[in-house]
A protein has these predicted regions:
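A beta-strand edge to alpha-helix "cap/lid" segment located at domain peripheries
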Residues: 4-7, 19-59, 63-155
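Repetitive helical segments and hydrophobic/amphipathic motifs
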Residues: 11-12
């Protein structure tokens, strides 16, 4: 009886340690993914400001779709074309209150964005909320979707 109890306690202890290590590894992995997404988003911002086709092509997934604050829908091809033609240009983009949720091979990024730029000659809405969806494809994180909503002033 005593031997069975000792074996059971040892088994539970080993299981608890293993679960703790797995949760710690999972937390570390999430943190690593969050850092990678933040870095990629910073690269995306710089690529948009500089109309860097190579970086935009690397960051955006081939099936990307984006919805701007005015409701304009753009594919990856349209995004790259609009940046390279000058139809869409930014002088500055900053983000704040960024949160990233990681789900295995997908991540959802939300936050506030302040943009100074023009879309076909018209000023883009300056203050927006955004949602971006990132998916790990062939070992790399790629942006598959984003959506902007104009921020409504609080009363």
């Amino acid at each position: 009886m005593r031997r069975t109890l000792v074996i059971a306690v040892l088994g539970l202890t080993a299981t608890s340690i293993a679960l703790g290590q797995k949760q710690s590894a999972s937390r570390n992995q999430r943190s690593s993914v969050e850092q990678a997404i933040r870095q990629l988003d910073n690269e995306r911002i710089q690529a948009q400001i500089g109309a860097d086709v190579v970086a935009l092509d690397r960051i955006y997934a081939d099936d990307f779709v984006g919805v701007g604050p005015s409701g304009t829908v753009r594919t990856k091809t349209q995004v790259i074309s609009d940046f390279t033609s000058g139809a869409l240009k930014f002088q500055s983009i900053t983000t704040d209150e960024v949160q990233i949720r990681v789900y295995e091979n997908a991540a959802v990024e939300t936050g506030l964005s302040t943009m100074v730029g023009q879309d076909k000659g018209k000023a883009v809405p300056r203050d927006t909320r955004f949602t971006r969806v990132w998916v790990k494809q062939q070992g790399r994180w790629r942006l598959v979707a984003n959506h902007y909503s104009s921020q409504i002033p609080q009363h």
